[in-house]
UniProtKB/Swiss-Prot annotation:
Alphabetical list of SUPFAM superfamilies matching this protein: Kelch motif, POZ domain
CDD domains: BACK_KLHL21, BTB_POZ_KLHL21
Annotated protein name in UniProt: Kelch-like protein 21
Main location: cytoplasm
Pathway membership: Protein modification; protein ubiquitination
This protein's record includes keyword Hydrolase: no
């Protein structure tokens, strides 16, 4: 008689009881499904019949319950169907039910143009999510101009969110073809409003969006013209060419007969003449559609690098693409103590000094031709002043004087100085007034003064106790609020002139000592300067008032401090294959490295030229 195997822990080579061998047969599920389908083919162990459209389908109750939550709920409940041998199904045809039953037993289904609609409806009703998703994927492949409108309606009716969104993207991207085929003319008002108001509407210029909206109204003017003002308000009128705005938009009867439409025309004209402060009065109409190639960009001018060399570089950053490009360099010596402001889509650099001589010169950057030109000088040479824009005019404010520049006349005029002289003041415009913040001359106490251009009068702002600033903070206006960014702290204070109230927002990611501040796209952008460890930084971070949070937006082409920054609108098409130097670029870091290389070469060339000139 053979002895049994000794499985005690003390046996040689036998593992302890704690040891185990987990086993998993990856093909088991497939073999099980195949076996169940074979039983179906052999008509064995059926325990019920489902019927639809006069066709009967013997099946296994367990298989249906395992494949569909609909059938699981039906068979597990207390309804008659839970124990019935035969169940009649409605709202589905026999052939479509046959496809779903085949899927239960095989995991396979063939979607065709003929069955996709009823199959998706049945999959939605009987809760087969993977079949429903397969139908959505098929419909997405079939999208074209002739069927996209119906597919979006169908997708939304059956809560196919992915298909609905991809179809909407297709429609927005092919709106011109839909208009050409007169498909847009049969849209409901709700749909037309949905497309016209979307930033992603793909038009080469805003004039095309106007024409499409007009085409829709004029296809049935009797029932649609009363909807025109509501549709009209979602057009980006400020970005329609001035001539076209006058000759074709304002002259259209639908527009000039509507007081509200004429009000929007005046708003667009004010924007185009730089009398409308887009940062102070945020509005969707002031945001160009990306497809037009026009973007609001951040422009960084001058500053100093890590060697404290003064820069004459001008870089621009597109937040839509995350890309940097360099613009025409400043044609003169920037020096220190200059001020920068954006008037419309032009940039003005005023004053400064070379350490021994003050400048009264004013340089204007014309963004449409990428060129710097000198305009009429200020009435007084100055440095460490402040400049800002209000009602289409450029204001320069210093401790002892205030002057104003009219770009249409290329002239300066002297205004009343501040009520109390302030050292190194910071200014911004908010709700049709100028606000200046700084320390009283020869004192440490901070005050805020306000200038009313209608009366040409300065006045003290009785705004209560000011925050404990060590230095005059940088200021910028956004949607009726003045933001004060400290130089020696990540804290940011907010003042509401309308309510005369103070508030705080979450602190910045890091400090930006000697950094720069600008408003762009409804956000605050802070860049460069020295960080918490007093290392020169290239960080660009932004604050979103809607989420009340800061986020890292990118990095400057090189670490910089004392630079100026503003935002303007400019054609800024994204680069994909070629970098600025014509060398293939895989990422933004390569772009920045190439910019720095070109800058370094240019700097060395100028340095060698100056050394040769000195000799």
């Amino acid at each position: 008689m053979e002895s049994p195997i000794n499985t005690s822990p003390d046996s040689v080579g036998i593992p302890a009881p704690e040891a185990a061998l987990p086993f998993y047969d990856a093909s088991h599920a497939l073999h099980l499904l195949r076996g169940i389908n074979e039983l179906r083919s052999e008509q064995k162990f059926f325990d019920m019949t489902v019927s639809a459209g006069g066709q009967d389908f013997p099946c296994h109750r367990t298989v249906l319950a395992a494949a569909s939550n609909y059938f699981r709920a039906m068979f597990a409940g207390r309804l008659r169907e839970s124990h019935a041998d035969r169940v009649e199904l409605h709202d589905v045809s026999g052939p479509i039910l046959s496809l779903l039953l085949d899927f239960c037993y095989t995991g396979r289904v063939t979607v065709t143009l003929e069955n996709v609609e009823p199959l998706l409806q049945a999959a939605d009703l009987f809760q087969f999510p993977s079949v429903k998703q397969a139908c959505c994927a098929y419909l997405e492949q079939q999208l074209d101009v002739s069927n996209c409108l119906e597919i979006q309606d169908f997708a939304e009716a059956y809560a196919c969110q992915g298909l609905a969104e991809s179809t909407k993207r297709f429609i927005l991207g092919h709106i011109a073809q839909l208009a050409q085929a007169h498909e847009v003319e049969r849209l409901t008002f709700k749909r037309m409003l949905e497309y016209i108001s979307d930033d992603r509407l793909c038009v080469d210029k805003e004039e095309s969006a106007f024409q499409i909206a007009l085409q829709w109204v004029k296809a049935d003017p009797k029932h649609r013209q009363y909807r025109w003002p509501e549709l009209f308000q979602y057009l980006r009128l400020p970005f329609i060419r001035r001539f076209y705005l006058l000759a074709y938009v304002e002259s259209d009867p639908l527009v000039f007969r509507s007081p509200y439409c004429l009000q929007l025309i005046r708003e667009a004209r004010a924007f185009q003449s730089s009398e409308y402060d887009r940062h102070d009065w945020l509005c969707h109409r002031m945001k160009p559609r990306p497809s037009t190639g026009l973007a609001e960009i951040l422009v960084v001018v001058g500053g100093c690098d890590q060697e404290c060399d003064e820069l004459v570089t001008v870089d621009c950053y597109n937040p839509q693409t995350g890309q940097w490009r360099y613009l025409a360099e400043f044609p003169d010596h920037l020096g220190g103590g200059y001020s920068i402001a954006a008037l419309g889509n032009d940039i003005y650099v005023t004053g400064g000094s070379d350490g021994s001589r003050l400048y009264d010169c004013v340089w204007r950057y014309n963004s449409s031709v990428n060129e710097w030109t000198e305009v009429s000088p200020m009435l007084k040479a100055r440095e460490y002043h402040s400049s800002t824009v209000l009602n289409g005019l450029l204001y320069v404010i210093a401790s002892d004087s205030t002057e104003r520049y009219d770009p249409t006349m290329d002239t300066w005029e002297s205004l009343h100085p501040m009520l109390y002289p302030m050292d190194n003041c910071s200014t911004t415009s908010c709700r049709k007034k100028l606000y200046a913040i700084g320390s009283l001359e020869g004192q440490e106490s901070m005050v805020m003064q306000c200038y009313n251009p209608d009366t040409n009068v300065w006045a003290m702002v009785n705004c209560g106790q000011l925050p404990p600033w060590s230095f005059a903070p940088k200021t910028v206006t956004l949607n009726g609020l003045i933001y004060f960014v400290r130089d020696d702290s990540p804290e940011v204070d907010v003042y509401n002139p309308s309510k005369n109230e103070w508030d705080k927002i979450p602190p910045m990611i890091q400090v930006h000592v000697g950094g720069s501040l600008a408003a762009l796209g409804g956000k605050l952008y802070v860049s460069g300067g020295y960080d918490n460890t007093f290392e020169l930084s290239d960080v660009v971070e932004a604050f979103d008032p809607e989420t009340r949070s800061w986020s890292l937006m990118g990095r400057l082409p090189q670490p910089t401090f004392w630079q100026g920054s503003v935002s303007i609108f400019r054609q800024f098409m994204p680069q994909t294959q070629q970098s600025l130097d014509g060398v293939p670029s895989d990422n933004t870091n390569n772009e920045r490295n190439i910019i720095n290389l070109n800058r370094r070469r240019h700097h060395l060339h100028n340095h060698n030229f100056n050394e040769l000139h000195r000799r």
